Amino acid sequence: MGEGTTKENNNAEFNAYHTLTAEEAAEFIGTSLTEGLTQDEFVHRLKTVGENTLGDDTKIDYKAMVLHQVCNAMIMVLLISMIISFAMHDWITGGVISFVIAVNVLIGLVQEYKATKTMNSLKNLSSPNAHVIRNGKSETINSKDVVPGDICLVKVGDTIPADLRLIETKNFDTDESLLTGESLPVSKDANLVFGKEEETSVGDRLNLAFSSSAVVKGRAKGIVIKTALNSEIGKIAKSLQGDSGLISRDPSKSWLQNTWISTKKVTGAFLGTNVGTPLHRKLSKLAVLLFWIAVLFAIIVMASQKFDVDKRVAIYAICVALSMIPSSLVVVLTITMSVGAAVMVSRNVIVRKLDSLEALGAVNDICSDKTGTLTQGKMLARQIWIPRFGTITISNSDDPFNPNEGNVSLIPRFSPYEYSHNEDGDVGILQNFKDRLYEKDLPEDIDMDLFQKWLETATLANIATVFKDDATDCWKAHGDPTEIAIQVFATKMDLPHNALTGEKSTNQSNENDQSSLSQHNEKPGSAQFEHIAEFPFDSTVKRMSSVYYNNHNETYNIYGKGAFESIISCCSSWYGKDGVKITPLTDCDVETIRKNVYSLSNEGLRVLGFASKSFTKDQVNDDQLKNITSNRATAESDLVFLGLIGIYDPPRNETAGAVKKFHQAGINVHMLTGDFVGTAKAIAQEVGILPTNLYHYSQEIVDSMVMTGSQFDGLSEEEVDDLPVLPLVIARCSPQTKVRMIEALHRRKKFCTMTGDGVNDSPSLKMANVGIAMGINGSDVSKEASDIVLSDDNFASILNAVEEGRRMTDNIQKFVLQLLAENVAQALYLIIGLVFRDENGKSVFPLSPVEVLWIIVVTSCFPAMGLGLEKAAPDLMDRPPHDSEVGIFTWEVIIDTFAYGIIMTGSCMASFTGSLYGINSGRLGHDCDGTYNSSCRDVYRSRSAAFATMTWCALILAWEVVDMRRSFFRMHPDTDSPVKEFFRSIWGNQFLFWSIIFGFVSAFPVVYIPVINDKVFLHKPIGAEWGLAIAFTIAFWIGAELYKCGKRRYFKTQRAHNPENDLESNNKRDPFEAYSTSTTIHTEVNIGIKQ
């Protein structure tokens, strides 16, 4: 057992298995290549090494959760108030405060518990099985039970459960894009052994296979060498865990300075002022500010009594302190965000961290991957060039698998290069090529045999299948995306694979169509072509070919396709100038073809070449035929070049519209992709990330707009900061490039989001202000590092998230304004109330502590929730992002808070004094802050009037802040009827409507129910005072409307003096205008790339 432990310790530290042979690796790790581990050894290693996971489920620490909820400055004020109340034996006030604390903490606990469970469920979205050899027998086990030393078997479609030193490989390729970012499969070879002195990167260790990689071809056997956090992917996951960095030492500073800095960081983290999103930090700072204001006001109360503090003075101090704390804010904020997160699920956005949804409202820049996010992740044929025949173009095809969609046109005789350089403009484009083909309505000088030969090759040098699913009535396809694109075009031209080979397809929709290109299946049960042999695509030669026998003309045919350079190297001839005779392929001819390859590539297309050759039965004997069908070099020699196809991954239908809306919202979109420059540039121009026909740009701007990863990484930080514009497109982008891009954005004070799906994207996802992972193709590690997960991997869903984030920010701003204005009103009202002295010279509070809490917690809480549910404003996505540094506390909000607070204070004070001195005798009695006595009648009745006034003013304020500038009676100026508009305004948000109605009605039972009114709320039933309450509530409403009218006049004047701030004119402005050096419009922007 001790020896085993030593081996395991050595294995954990050893990272050079690529330098060992399979036998040496097996001996080092202590396993058998044929028998695998014994059951006893497996049990021991599982106990020693642990399960093969990237970390346990997040443990639910209830104590820590409670502490996290309590460590809030607002809750601290409530706690202190509760303790003082109980110490003074004011059980009612203490009990009410305890209830408020319990509600806040409970709701926070529930939400944090849900977030923890969500994280755990995301970790367990995929838990694949593993196939291993133990005790000489093959077993299927859960991948978490894999341990170092297991012999693992993997095949096509499997996810590799751990890092492996390969023993055997058979045509074995893996997709390591989640780890390395490289999209192309990597061919593995178990027989390779690398030198110990060589510096071999992870991606180049071709005798190893890595955890979480997908097997895309072949099968293999390997020794498990690393599991869990010791695997390559585990190392990335471990780096993401990190530490808080709160306590650190700077060698250049003294011990005292370091202690002070660390104390500030820890205190800030404890109070939430230096961690979290901008809103979280702002609210935490607000809570701290309100805490000290509450303490200050309590001191003022005690000072007014010359610090002669008894029970009544202490209770008054508590009352004033409570008036400054928006006790329901945490509850309302949590519920609003929870509702927003629930809404986003229906819009394909899963919110892992609630605060991140609000943070999206401040996003200035979005950095997105291309494949599968901006694009469909599927391939479409776009252009085909057949020498001496012409260029075929396929357009308006949205469904990559549907051959019945799209328009096919032909430019006769012109090549893509000739067409792009043609200055006459008239090239004789023939629309509806397929219909013309059937009707034989084509120019006589066009040789259809050339098209027939190319299409036959495209169909047969292909193993993909395209069919219509009868159950769903949808077109589907199986095979490689590139081959599917070619097969879809062949099917579009009524020459699918099974039409030539006779393979049965119950789902073939074109079985009744008569092909104009082939007379296949003339005899029942016969097939024109019989498959003889195939040489599959190989990443080394980058081509594939198939050998068929043509039963109709008794010829053997070899059809090949692949990368242009690979195919052209196998060709010795092509069809000559007359398009009929085969002529030798000269260097000049190859250069002509290559120009067309570049022309297609510059349009962002992936280019493949096609070639074929044929010979009769009489031209070869059996030995020669056997050599051709078994020897790739022989079969793929002396081919005849037939043509090119350009295919591409089309943008999603929603992408261009989403990009346009982002630009309209003042958000820049950057494409960071591993694809080639030409492809990235073309897609970016197609969806609007890059300009096309708008303005003329300086060369400096052009060079900055599009870069390769190596160009960007080659710049120093100073050079990046000096760029006139950060790149809108970075091609051949590495994970480190993405991190550098985020750092550059942060240095420019930008608030950015990053999308990603691979493990290698995790550092950039975590560094971005908002990390967005892909739900379908994303790795578990990337989801763990993200704040938001897109369940459909669709770029347009980010628009949904940003819109919801802005809506929430708007609504949070509204209810924060409502709640804080009430706090200001109550605090000013109570401070002014210090002037009311009873017969003993003690201050009489014009509102009791329970009245204060009732208004803050009960009356205001539900309208605030209603404000949180307000629909998005019509111009929401026409505004620029809000300043993340300022957040929701703009100068307008701050001024509004004090303005409404002062108007409300005036209304309530007028109601109290009018009741006390107008309707009643004006007697202030004695000991009226405690138990009721006969001398307190006037005070108790006046409190009721003031309580009703403040309650109703708070409710009216909720309606007023629905729009911060428009009149409550003209919320929707586009409505013709004022009456209809009024009812639309109050009924549009039914939750808000009924919560306000509830608040209005609730004032009556609170005033009239015996015991509750005089024992708890310290007020009495009233009569004529209701008239005062109603009158001064209306006065507040009029005051609020007059204030908003003044605001509208002010901002109208500001727009007149500063038209650039007008939203409507900004919407008409070109999003790239800031980069323009002239106003010459409709100038083609030719963005060149430095080589």
Curated annotation (Swiss-Prot):
Residues 85-90, 304-312, 837-848, 907-943, 1013-1021 are extracellular. GO terms for cellular component: cell periphery; fungal-type vacuole; plasma membrane. Keywords: ATP-binding, Cell membrane, Ion transport, Magnesium, Membrane, Metal-binding, Nucleotide-binding, Potassium, Potassium transport, Sodium, Sodium transport, Translocase, Transmembrane, Transmembrane helix, Transport. GO terms for biological process: cellular response to glucose starvation; hyperosmotic response; intracellular calcium ion homeostasis; monoatomic ion transmembrane transport; potassium ion transport; response to pH; response to salt stress; sodium ion transport. Its EC number is 7.2.2.3. The keyword tRNA processing does not apply. GO terms for molecular function: ATP binding; ATP hydrolysis activity; metal ion binding; P-type potassium transmembrane transporter activity; P-type sodium transporter activity. The active site is phosphorylated in presence of sodium or potassium and in conditions of higher pH. Not phosphorylated in presence of calcium ions. Gene3D superfamilies: Calcium-transporting ATPase, cytoplasmic domain N, Calcium-transporting ATPase, cytoplasmic transduction domain A, Calcium-transporting ATPase, transmembrane domain, HAD superfamily/HAD-like. Mg(2+) binds at residues 369, 371, 757. The active site is at residue 369. Residues 499-525 are annotated as: Disordered. PROSITE patterns: ATPASE_E1_E2 (PS00154). Induction: By sodium ions. Induction at low salt concentrations (0.3 M) is mediated by the high-osmolarity glycerol (HOG)-MAP kinase pathway, a system activated by non-specific osmotic stress, and by the protein kinase A pathway. At high salt concentrations (0.8 M) is mediated by the protein phosphatase calcineurin, which is specifically activated by sodium ions. ATP binds at residues 371, 483, 561, 606, 673-675, 732, 738, 760. It is a multi-pass membrane protein. It catalyses: Na(+)(in) + ATP + H2O = Na(+)(out) + ADP + phosphate + H(+); K(+)(in) + ATP + H2O = K(+)(out) + ADP + phosphate + H(+). The chain crosses the membrane at residues 64-84, 91-111, 283-303, 313-333, 816-836, 849-869, 886-906, 944-964, 992-1012, 1022-1042. Residues 503-519 have a biased composition (Polar residues). Belongs to the cation transport ATPase (P-type) (TC 3.A.3) family. Type IID subfamily. Catalyzes the hydrolysis of ATP coupled with the export of sodium and potassium from the cell. May export potassium less efficiently. May transport other cations such as lithium. Sodium/potassium efflux ATPases are involved in salt tolerance and maintaining the membrane potential across the plasma membrane in high salinity (Na+) or alkaline (K+) environments. Is negatively modulated by SIS2/HAL3. NCBIfam families: ATPase-IID_K-Na, ATPase_P-type. Present with 688 molecules/cell in log phase SD medium. This is Sodium/potassium exporting P-type ATPase 1. It comes from Saccharomyces cerevisiae (strain ATCC 204508 / S288c).
